[in-house]
């Protein structure tokens, strides 16, 4: 991610669904100037992030604000970088903000990075509940091709969509082997064995990047 966002120093960076601040703090460790703004819907996570910023002595670099569900309350062309990350630091309260709205607040030449967990077909509330039980709190219905199309429709260029499901699958397999709870068996079975839903067949971890044209 860092390579696709460089340079970071002195940049204005927006982090969507910033949770307890994992990504903003990660960015702050890699820059000495600029402004990193995280927006989050969950009040408890927002409060925790603000407290952590003070404790870490990063309030001069990092700010956290309450998010809105369907829009970004910022002017056009405001940020140099935008990150929407749902894999390493997922939030239980995602927004419903699409790529066009994200692109709107990016400056010309600005860079966008999105990570997501996707299912390629609709799943029932019962299946979603079983996956939630093992820690898969958020799933986006769509395909890698959909994400590419959405980025293109938002006017972004230099688009790349990467599938890194095989790397994450090994992590889930280790978790299953270490988890003795019988209530989690169905969730692991769905994610790792179900013919239509399992990782690499119906569920994927993707990384998406794009750039807003400079002119």
Predicted features by range, described:
Residues 160-215:
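Conserved Class I S-adenosyl-L-methionine
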Residues 117-138:
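Short, glycine-/aromatic-enriched active-site segment of Class I SAM-dependent methyltransferases
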Residues 1-11, 26:
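Conserved alpha-helix/loop element of class I SAM-dependent methyltransferases that forms part
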């Amino acid at each position: 991610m860092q390579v696709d966002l460089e340079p970071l120093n002195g940049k204005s960076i927006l982090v969507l669904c910033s949770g307890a601040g994992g990504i903003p703090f990660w960015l702050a460790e890699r820059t000495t100037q600029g402004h990193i703004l995280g927006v989050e819907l969950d009040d408890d996570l927002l409060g925790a992030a603000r407290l952590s910023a003070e404790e870490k002595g990063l309030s001069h670099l990092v700010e956290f604000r309450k998010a809105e569900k369907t829009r970004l309350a910022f002017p056009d062309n405001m940020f140099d970088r935008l990150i929407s990350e749902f894999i390493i630091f997922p939030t239980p309260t995602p927004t419903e903000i699409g790529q066009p709205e994200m692109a709107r607040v990016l400056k010309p030449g600005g860079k966008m990075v999105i990570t997501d967990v996707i299912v390629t077909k609709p799943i029932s509330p019962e299946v979603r509940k079983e996956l939630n039980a093992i820690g898969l709190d958020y799933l986006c219905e769509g395909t890698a091709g959909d994400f590419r199309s959405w980025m293109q429709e938002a006017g972004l260029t230099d688009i790349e969509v990467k599938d890194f499901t095989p790397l994450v699958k090994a992590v889930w397999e280790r978790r299953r082997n270490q988890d003795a709870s019988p209530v989690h068996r169905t969730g692991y079975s769905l994610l790792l064995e179900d013919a239509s839903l399992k990782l690499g067949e119906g569920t994927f971890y993707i990384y998406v990047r794009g750039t807003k044209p400079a002119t």
